[in-house]
């Protein structure tokens, strides 16, 4: 039995408040200054269409507005959240449809604002030919209630007996209600075996996952009897809210567990037991945004598989084939992940390596060669620079083998080992088509790297079976080597074919891939910081919005 039709939505993002100012705007009014307003548009991931999200207030007679009305956006690290800020001069009728009222616009991603120094960026306004349109200043602030963590403990009494030869094996499932009336699963307790009076272990959950910041939003809790075959028996349910749960900080709260079917069929039905909230507390913890705002940089490194199993790059059947019409799976994976991570790296310089190729002129086999052919400086300028070096390498090296991961993992680990203050966190993207040839050495490298500020993303391309890669992704069983277990789960593996859009929409394919492979990075960074007791540094001092010269009346 599936658990009560929970939807497949992501856990709610943290909420980011954007403050907007402008400087040196165009002056369109004849007898006074412009009356500016900013309109924010967000871009749909699926259709790429721009939709209006909100507007600031209008500030009269100024070219240097500091707007009071803010924009509050859900923030997902793993998504490219494109924003467009349009600035208008608004007349008394609030009419902004005329082209002459347009003062300029700026395009950028939400990640660029958060990744800016002190989560603050300044961008030039463009869009009016032949005119300097001034600048827009954007500041991102995480809403305070997004960092709250609720810890609670529950027990039950006299639950219905569901097992024929014994008592029930009860567990709880928590659901957050959505605005459209559906429910999203947000937590499952452990199973307590063979009892009708279970006491569950205390657990913690982000408040935003429980209610998305709405303290009165319905929280539904289902009670199930666990069955080995997965067809868990429904015992009953009850509803509450974050606000009601929080009252347990001062008193026990008892809920009746009701089974709607039994209630309809049996006149004398009272309930299927009770659940008691024994304790409830709320604490704040540091978030991913805290570390980014404090200056932590994400250092992105790429490693690409140049083994012969990819096929001749000159042939359309090759996974490396450079079609003039569309990107290869390798290029799509690189672009999808890199274009998001680059917003959190101030210098935009990315080391990029290949492995499994014979290098000219002597034909030496290398498992860690710089794509830009520069052993002293393997950095490429931006993701476009990485792609350019990758395409150039395909023209000069000979695809060969075998497939070794350990050398490039150890290379990045050596750099990460030099950082212990939380100022940098390394993300290695490995893109490969086949079976790994150095599994023992790779496991050893991963176990060693698990104690460092480092995460590894592996994307499998092509039709191969990737069972060995699943073994490296420690979601279910922690990776081990020589009896030593990885300190943290730092590997995320996905097969690219699972994300290819059937209609051939490459933008959508890349967005889906990035969403899955990057979703774990914030928590992996936080787990490293917590185990090392590293607190985020205070945001660097940022000069206040530049004060313009006094405007002449």
From Swiss-Prot:
Cofactor(s) listed: Ca(2+)
What does the entry list as the binding residues for Ca(2+) 1?
163, 169, 225, 227
Q: Which InterPro entries match?
A: C2_dom, C2_domain_sf, C2B_Copine, Copine, Copine_C, VWF_A, vWFA_dom_sf
PROSITE patterns, alphabetically? C2, VWFA
One GO biological process this protein is involved in is:
cell differentiation
What are the Pro residues biased-composition ranges?
536-553
Concerning SUPFAM superfamilies, the annotation shows: C2 domain (Calcium/lipid-binding domain, CaLB), vWA-like
Keyword Plastid assigned to the entry: answer is: no
* Keywords annotated in UniProt: Calcium, Differentiation, Metal-binding, Repeat
The entry marks the following residues as binding Ca(2+) 2, namely 163, 225, 227, 233
Entry coiled-coil feature ranges = none
Return the annotated region ranges for Disordered. Answer: 531-553
Task: Fetch the Pfam families from UniProt.
Answer: C2, Copine
* CDD domains in the record: C2A_Copine (cd04048), C2B_Copine (cd04047), vWA_copine_like (cd01459)
Q: Where is the VWFA domain?
A: 299-500
Residue ranges of every copy of the C2 domain listed in the record:
1-125, 132-255
Give a GO molecular function annotation for the protein: calcium-dependent phospholipid binding
| Highest taxon of the lineage | Eukaryota
- Give the matching Gene3D superfamilies: C2 domain
Q: Which family does it belong to?
A: Belongs to the copine family.
What's its job? Probable calcium-dependent phospholipid-binding protein that may play a role in calcium-mediated intracellular processes. Plays a role in dendrite formation by melanocytes.
Could you identify this protein by its name? Copine-9
User: Which organism encodes this protein?
Assistant: Mus musculus
Q: What gene is this protein a product of? A: Cpne9
